[in-house]
Protein backbone atom coordinates (compact mmCIF):
# COMPACT_ATOMS: atom_id res chain seq x y z
CA UNK A 1 0.00 0.00 0.00
CA UNK A 2 1.19 3.49 -0.79
CA UNK A 3 -0.04 5.86 1.89
CA UNK A 4 -0.92 9.48 1.41
CA UNK A 5 0.97 11.78 3.76
CA UNK A 6 -1.92 12.72 6.05
CA UNK A 7 -3.35 9.20 5.96
CA UNK A 8 -0.01 7.90 7.22
CA UNK A 9 0.22 10.62 9.86
CA UNK A 10 -3.22 9.62 11.16
CA UNK A 11 -2.29 5.91 11.28
CA UNK A 12 1.01 6.65 13.04
CA UNK A 13 -0.82 8.81 15.56
CA UNK A 14 -3.42 6.10 16.14
CA UNK A 15 -0.63 3.61 16.89
CA UNK A 16 1.01 5.92 19.40
CA UNK A 17 4.04 7.32 17.56
CA UNK A 18 3.33 11.01 18.21
CA UNK A 19 5.97 12.08 20.73
CA UNK A 20 7.04 8.49 21.30
CA UNK A 21 10.43 8.79 23.03
CA UNK A 22 10.14 12.53 22.45
CA UNK A 23 9.90 12.36 18.64
CA UNK A 24 6.97 14.34 17.25
CA UNK A 25 4.74 12.85 14.56
CA UNK A 26 6.39 14.98 11.86
CA UNK A 27 9.68 13.16 12.45
CA UNK A 28 8.08 9.81 11.71
CA UNK A 29 6.22 11.00 8.61
CA UNK A 30 9.41 12.62 7.30
CA UNK A 31 11.39 9.43 7.93
CA UNK A 32 8.80 7.33 6.08
CA UNK A 33 8.84 9.73 3.14
CA UNK A 34 12.59 9.47 2.67
CA UNK A 35 12.92 5.79 3.59
CA UNK A 36 10.12 4.33 1.46
CA UNK A 37 8.15 7.14 -0.20
CA UNK A 38 5.22 5.96 1.99
CA UNK A 39 5.24 2.53 0.34
CA UNK A 40 4.67 -0.42 2.69
CA UNK A 41 6.12 -2.82 0.11
CA UNK A 42 9.47 -1.07 -0.30
CA UNK A 43 12.58 -3.25 0.00
CA UNK A 44 16.22 -2.30 -0.41
CA UNK A 45 19.21 -4.63 -0.38
CA UNK A 46 22.29 -3.49 1.54
CA UNK A 47 25.93 -4.17 0.69
CA UNK A 48 26.29 -6.40 3.77
CA UNK A 49 23.65 -8.81 2.44
CA UNK A 50 20.85 -7.59 4.70
CA UNK A 51 17.64 -6.03 3.40
CA UNK A 52 15.47 -3.14 4.62
CA UNK A 53 11.70 -3.70 4.65
CA UNK A 54 8.51 -1.69 4.64
CA UNK A 55 7.44 1.88 5.22
CA UNK A 56 10.24 2.54 7.72
CA UNK A 57 12.84 0.30 6.01
CA UNK A 58 13.50 -1.97 8.96
CA UNK A 59 16.67 -4.02 8.62
CA UNK A 60 16.89 -7.82 8.52
CA UNK A 61 20.33 -7.97 10.16
CA UNK A 62 18.98 -6.72 13.48
CA UNK A 63 15.23 -6.40 13.62
CA UNK A 64 13.33 -8.93 11.50
CA UNK A 65 13.87 -12.36 9.98
CA UNK A 66 13.70 -12.80 6.20
CA UNK A 67 15.16 -16.31 6.15
CA UNK A 68 18.20 -15.25 4.14
CA UNK A 69 20.24 -12.83 6.23
CA UNK A 70 23.04 -14.69 7.98
CA UNK A 71 23.21 -14.15 11.74
CA UNK A 72 20.02 -12.13 12.04
CA UNK A 73 19.25 -11.04 15.60
CA UNK A 74 15.50 -10.61 14.90
CA UNK A 75 15.15 -8.29 17.89
CA UNK A 76 11.53 -7.46 16.99
CA UNK A 77 10.66 -11.18 16.84
CA UNK A 78 8.89 -10.79 13.53
CA UNK A 79 9.17 -11.97 9.96
CA UNK A 80 10.26 -9.21 7.61
CA UNK A 81 7.30 -9.89 5.33
CA UNK A 82 4.98 -8.85 8.19
CA UNK A 83 6.51 -5.36 7.92
CA UNK A 84 5.21 -4.99 4.35
CA UNK A 85 1.45 -5.27 4.82
CA UNK A 86 -1.08 -2.47 4.37
CA UNK A 87 -1.46 -2.32 8.16
CA UNK A 88 1.54 -0.46 9.57
CA UNK A 89 0.99 -1.73 13.15
CA UNK A 90 3.82 -4.32 12.99
CA UNK A 91 6.26 -1.72 11.59
CA UNK A 92 5.24 0.74 14.29
CA UNK A 93 5.72 -1.85 17.04
CA UNK A 94 9.19 -2.65 15.75
CA UNK A 95 10.07 1.03 15.22
CA UNK A 96 9.21 1.67 18.88
CA UNK A 97 11.65 -1.07 19.84
CA UNK A 98 14.35 0.40 17.56
CA UNK A 99 13.95 3.99 18.75
CA UNK A 100 14.14 2.81 22.37
CA UNK A 101 17.48 1.13 21.73
CA UNK A 102 19.68 4.07 22.70
CA UNK A 103 20.36 5.89 19.46
CA UNK A 104 16.82 7.17 18.96
CA UNK A 105 15.84 8.02 15.39
CA UNK A 106 19.51 8.22 14.39
CA UNK A 107 19.01 4.53 13.56
CA UNK A 108 17.35 5.77 10.34
CA UNK A 109 19.91 7.18 7.88
CA UNK A 110 17.24 9.01 5.89
CA UNK A 111 15.98 10.69 9.07
CA UNK A 112 19.51 11.85 9.94
CA UNK A 113 20.05 13.11 6.41
CA UNK A 114 16.71 14.77 5.64
CA UNK A 115 14.68 15.32 8.81
CA UNK A 116 16.95 15.83 11.82
CA UNK A 117 17.21 19.47 12.80
CA UNK A 118 14.57 20.61 10.29
CA UNK A 119 11.06 21.94 10.92
CA UNK A 120 9.30 18.58 10.75
CA UNK A 121 5.92 20.11 11.63
CA UNK A 122 5.53 20.83 7.89
CA UNK A 123 5.06 17.07 7.37
CA UNK A 124 1.76 17.10 9.25
CA UNK A 125 0.62 20.53 8.11
CA UNK A 126 -3.04 20.63 6.99
CA UNK A 127 -3.64 17.07 8.20
CA UNK A 128 -6.80 16.73 10.26
CA UNK A 129 -5.35 14.86 13.20
UniProtKB/Swiss-Prot annotation:
Disulfide bonds join 6-127, 30-115, 64-80, 76-94. Its EC number is 3.2.1.17. InterPro entries: Glyco_hydro_22, Glyco_hydro_22_CS, Glyco_hydro_22_lys, Lysozyme-like_dom_sf. Its main location: secreted. Residues 1-129 form the C-type lysozyme domain. The active site is at 35, 52. CDD domains: LYZ_C. Monomer. Lysozyme C is capable of both hydrolysis and transglycosylation; it also shows a slight esterase activity. It acts rapidly on both peptide-substituted and unsubstituted peptidoglycan, and slowly on chitin oligosaccharides. This is Lysozyme C. It comes from Ortalis vetula.
Amino acid sequence: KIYKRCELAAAMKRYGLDNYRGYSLGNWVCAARYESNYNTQATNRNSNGSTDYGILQINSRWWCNDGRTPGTKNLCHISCSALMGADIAPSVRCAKRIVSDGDGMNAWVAWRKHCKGTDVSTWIKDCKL
